[in-house]
UniProtKB/Swiss-Prot annotation:
It comes from Anopheles stephensi (Indo-Pakistan malaria mosquito). PANTHER family: 26S PROTEASOME NON-ATPASE REGULATORY SUBUNIT 3, 26S PROTEASOME NON-ATPASE REGULATORY SUBUNIT 3/COP9 SIGNALOSOME COMPLEX SUBUNIT 3. Residues 253-432 form the PCI domain. Belongs to the proteasome subunit S3 family. Residues 462-484 are annotated as: Disordered. GO terms for biological process: regulation of protein catabolic process; ubiquitin-dependent protein catabolic process. The gene is DOXA2. Keywords: Proteasome. This is Probable 26S proteasome non-ATPase regulatory subunit 3. GO terms for molecular function: enzyme regulator activity. The keyword NAD does not apply. One of its GO terms (cellular component) is proteasome regulatory particle, lid subcomplex.
Length: 500
């Protein structure tokens, strides 16, 4: 009896669960279709913005579209791309063009999905800029799918299309295409093959005053040289080319980072540190976490080479804590002047340092570790023998310690004297730093930075054209006009009185 009553209860309880699961699946499918519909409508709006920029000759509309590319690339599903391709290439020989080769499993004779067709989209042919933008979206989608063979062919076709056009309205889209063309070659480990092409496009962009194209191409060439550790060629490119001041913040940040790497490799650590800090400030503070991690690693190494110790709060940032772990241990080894720990850090994280392109600079830190250790010894002891110094530094012989101490005294690391006859090093009393020019120089550096920042901010502001002020009347003209209006009103009032 119990089993007979329990069976219908269990059946009744299980039925709503099935309904809920079916409803949730239907809701998910509906939400997916809605997202695809919104994505197609958004990219259509981008095409309208590009057409508007071409007609009005105002490039800021295209710039607005390109700024939303990181958001758009996450919405490039197969249905979205296929729907846009059906609209852009509805019939004729263009329907069998190169673009369809990069849309997988979407037959050329297929119809557009229901709800995604815009009747007004087939009335007029699209502009060349819209075609290049759609081709760029296909390339970005192939890169996200890691389909390098198709991405390589797509990139080559896109470059052929860009080079064959001589339209100034295409410059901003072409600049973005150059970046992704270089990215495809980098993923294929074939950057050297496109170097001459990038140089030729840089000459063309310079002659046409294409500032965004110049900035992108200079950065691509610098990345190309630095990928193969060609620092001399990169330095020559920087000296012989002019990076445009009107370039976007992202391109400026990239250029400053590459410039910092070049200067650090050429032992110009102060200049390198200045460029890298500016790159961090120009980079997006919320997005571009990978770029900030890369720059911050190099900043830490350069600061250590300058003899400074980075603040602990740098390593505590949530987005940087994990990636800066090896550099935190490196900083501790340098701060304590511990050669043994420095060697352990190199042994444990050497491969990661090589991937970060900081291993060569970190090798130079060994001298800084020794200098830090000698400075600590000089502060702790007023008199110490070379044998004790060799034992503390882990050196093989007292002669090596004596040589290192002599070099440190000559470089100004410590203020001491070395007495070989009596066999000890005597440290002099420390001087007051405020009696030197160092505080004045540091204050001057900060004031100069503030003034430069103010000047750059003023230059970046947009002002109305000078002709705008001519249309506005001055205060004196306004008073004269008001006086004339008052006189005219009085005359009209007197005439009315005369009529009565």
């Amino acid at each position: 009896m119990v089993s007979q009553t329990a069976t219908p209860t269990a059946t009744a309880a299980s039925e709503p669960i099935v309904d809920v699961e079916m409803e949730s699946a239907e809701d998910a499918e509906t939400a997916k279709k809605d997202a695809e519909l919104l994505a197609v409508q958004e990219i259509r709006d981008h095409a309208r913005q590009i057409d508007k920029a071409v007609v009005s000759k105002e490039p800021r509309f295209i710039l607005r579209v390109l700024r939303s590319l990181p958001t758009t690339r996450r919405k490039l599903a197969l249905v979205v791309v296929g729907s846009l391709a059906v609209q852009l290439y509805p019939a004729g020989p263009e329907r069998d063009g190169n673009q369809w080769a990069y849309i997988e499993d979407y037959p050329a004779g297929a119809q557009e999905p229901e709800g995604l067709h815009d009747p007004g989209s087939d009335k007029s042919p699209f502009a060349q800029e819209v075609d290049a933008y759609f081709h760029l979206l296909l390339l970005v989608r192939l890169l996200d799918k890691n389909d390098l063979p198709k991405a390589t062919k797509c990139s080559q076709d896109l470059m052929a299309k860009i080079v064959g056009q001589n339209r100034r309205s295409l410059d901003l889209i072409a600049a973005k295409c150059y970046f992704y063309h270089s990215r495809v070659s980098e993923l294929n480990n074939d950057l050297e093959s496109i170097r001459s092409f990038l140089h030729s496009r840089l000459r063309t962009a310079t002659l046409r005053n294409d500032f965004e194209g110049q900035a992108v191409l200079i950065n691509c060439l610098l990345r190309n040289y630095l990928h193969y550790s060609l620092y001399d060629q990169a330095d020559k490119l920087v000296n012989k080319s002019v990076f445009p001041e009107t370039a976007s913040n992202n391109e400026c940040a990239r250029f400053l980072y590459y410039l910092g790497r070049i200067k650090a490799a050429k032992l110009e650590y102060s200049v390198a540190h200045k460029q890298l800090v500016q790159a961090l400030r120009k980079a997006p503070q919320q997005a571009a976490v990978g770029f900030r991690q890369t720059v911050q690693k190099l900043v830490i190494v350069v600061e250590l080479l300058l003899g400074d110790i980075p603040e602990r709060k740098v390593f505590r940032q949530a987005a940087l804590r994990r990636s800066l772990g090896p550099y935190f241990q490196l900083t501790q080894a340098v701060r304590m002047g511990n050669l043994q720990r420095f060697g352990e850090v190199l042994e444990n994280f050497g491969e990661q340092f090589r991937q970060d392109h900081t291993f060569t600079l970190i090798i130079r830190l060994r001298h800084n570790v020794i200098k830090t250790a000698i400075r600590s010894i000089g502060l702790a002891y007023s008199r110490i023998s070379p044998q004790d110094i060799a034992r503390k530094l882990g050196l093989d012989s007292p002669e090596d310690a004596e040589f290192i101490v002599a070099k440190a005294i000559r470089d100004g690391v410590i203020d001491a004297t070395l007495d070989p006859e009596k066999g000890y090093m005597r440290t002099k009393e420390s001087t007051d730093i405020y009696s030197t020019r160092e505080p004045q120089l540091a204050f001057h550096q900060r004031i100069s930075f503030c003034l430069d920042l103010h000047n750059q901010s003023v230059k970046a502001m947009r002002y109305p054209p000078k002709s705008y002020g001519k249309e506005l009347e001055s205060a004196e003209e306004r008073r004269e006009r008001e006086q004339q209006d008052l006189e005219l009103a009085k005359e009209m009032a007197e005439e009315d009185d005369d009529d009565f």
